[in-house]
Amino acid sequence: MRWPPWASNTQASNNDHPTTTNNNDPKNLLDWSAFTELRTLIPTLVLTTGILSAFTLHRNYLRRFPTAVNITPAYYRRRSILGKVTSVGDGDNFRIYHTPGGRLAGWGWVPWKKVPTTRKELRDQTIHVRIAGVDAPEQAHFGRPAQPFGKEAHEWLTGYLINRRVRIYVHRQDQYQRVVATVFVRRALDFPVPFRRRDVGYEMLRKGLATVYEAKVGAEFGGEVMEKKYRSAEWWAKARGLGLWKGFKKNRDAWESPREFKTRTGMEDVGDGKK
């Protein structure tokens, strides 16, 4: 039926067939307005924030570094790493198993967070640490003779650190895939203050078990303040003839520092490479 008179055939045809809706259109299948309601928005925001916070927490504080090369530069001179000492290679280097978060994160008491004990389990899973700012006498390596007090320095460091938790402040990585770091440890039987935090490098210098690191390149102390502190500790031991300085007082001409000994024997400062 054509009404009004001026209406076209096309218009009349369109009016005779009502408009249909495409039920296959996703826009018609979902009620998008539901996503803007507070009862939906708030739980979604809380869940998203929680997931992002957990990811950030794990990435910044709970991520475990298997070896020194895995440590990101963001840690250098800014962050510390907590770990358990698994072996002592020489008088100034050792290896730790990184335990991020420590006991609060379950290390030592949660069944699946235990430090391995066998060499096979520890292989490629420990961080090789070179104590910053100190140079200990060398042990016998690769057929070369040991330096006086090399054995004593190694035995002292082993007894002081092995199987203990230490905190290392990483300064950089060296050419031997080790991290050069200032090392701190707490010991229950530390007289006169139990659990006092001790600077391991400083303690070695005070006891005459090491000298200040004297290489022309690569020396790292963690700042001028630490360097002055270490040189003062060395002076203390030297003035009293402690440890390796006994030989210095007896015969200065024949005495060799760890650096001079390495130069004379051609011994590289690489430790023993134990895992």
Curated annotation (Swiss-Prot):
Isomerase recorded as keyword: no
Entry GO CC: membrane; mitochondrion
Gene behind this protein: lcl3
Low complexity bias spans: 14-25
EC number(s) given by UniProt: 3.1.-.-
Top-level EC class: hydrolase
Active site: R130, E138, R178
Subcellular localization: Mitochondrion; Membrane
Positions contributing to Ca(2+) binding: D135
Molecular function per GO: endonuclease activity; metal ion binding
Stored Gene3D superfamilies: 2.40.50.90
Alphabetic keyword roster: Calcium, Endonuclease, Hydrolase, Membrane, Metal-binding, Mitochondrion, Nuclease, Transmembrane, Transmembrane helix
Key word Membrane present: yes
Membrane-spanning parts: 41-57
Region listing for Disordered, in residue ranges: 1-25
Major subcellular location class: mitochondrion
Membrane topology reported for the UniProt record: Single-pass membrane protein
InterPro entries: SNase_OB-fold_sf, Staphylococal_nuclease_OB-fold
Every TNase-like domain range: 79-247
The protein's name: Probable endonuclease lcl3
SMART domains in the cross-refs: SNc (SM00318)
Organism (species): Aspergillus niger (strain ATCC MYA-4892 / CBS 513.88 / FGSC A1513)
Family: Belongs to the LCL3 family.
